[in-house]
C-alpha cells in the first residue's frame, strides 16, 4: 500500500489529537526526570492551553511522593476504572479491556493495570494513530473501525472515570493533575448509561488488516 506525503485536514487533526491523548496519558503516569523531559517535548506538539499549563505546573510541582499520595491506597482520587463501577466484576472488566487491547495489538508502555486511566488514555492515542495510518493507506474501512472503536471505548470505559476523577482532583491541591483531569473530562464527557454495553471486538477480527504500519506507543 502507498502513502502520500501531504497530510489532509483530517489527518492533521488525528495527529494533533493523538499527541494530546498521549500527553494526557503521560501526565497521569508516575513522575521522573525523564518523564519531565518527555512531557515538555509532547507539549510542544499540542495547542491545548489546559494541557500546556498542566505541563508547566508539573515541572515545578510533580514528584513521586505527591503522585502516590493522590492516587495510592486511601488517596483522594482513585485512577482505576474499577473503582467507579458499582456492579461490574473486576475479572469481567479486565477481560473486556484486554480483548480491546489485543484486538488492536496495543501493548501499554507502563506496568499499570489495564483499567488505569493512563493506560486507557494511551489506548485512545494509539487508536488515533491507527486511524491516521489507515487513512494514509487509503483504507477507509479500517480507519472507520479505529474511529468507531475509539468512540465506543470512550463511552463505555473512560467516561466512567473522567468526570468523577476530575471532581476529586479539583479539591486535591495538586494543580497539574487538576488541570489534566479537566482536559480529560472535556474530551470524554459525562458517564454513559450502564445499559448501553457494546460487543467487544474479539482478538481475531481486526488487527491483521492494518498493513500500512503499526502505530507505536512511545
Label each PLM-derived region with a short phrase.
Residues 1-218:
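Surface/interface-facing alpha-helical segments and adjacent flexible terminal/loop regions used
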